Amino acid sequence: MSRPSLLRVLSIPLVALLAGAGVPPAHAESHVPCHTLPDAVLRHAKAEAESATIRGCVKEKENGRLSYEVETVKDGRSRDILLDASGSILEVEQEVTPDSLPAAVAAAIAKAAHGGKVGMIESVTRGDAIASYETTITSKGQRREVAFTPQGAPVKAD
């Protein structure tokens, strides 16, 4: 029985690796210094943040679209502002307390948790209305994200 050559053994993983080399990821993000954001983005983010402290900035590219997330904190609660490259606000994620949730959302999260640990809960606002509530649930060493409409219906993944 002959042994395969080293070239043959390495060629399969190498071809697999190179096959994806030219394909950009669907979603990529990186932390960037806030002063490097476009002027309009920084100006609108600061106006939206009001008196909150800016913790950091993230540059995101998803499906070819560039956006920026400005992470803020006020009174111990996080609030993240997502803006497009022109400075228009796309959405705001704001930490909320469990007792502030609509009853249907609280019930949906409790049901999804199945006794697991519920992480920080955020409201996601698009335009002038809350579009969804998001959280993470950790159970048996597994962590998963869940999202619900304000009426408590599950939000389908994009």
Task: Report the location of each language-model feature.
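Long, terminal "pre-/pro-" and other extracytoplasmic accessory regions
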Residues: 2-158
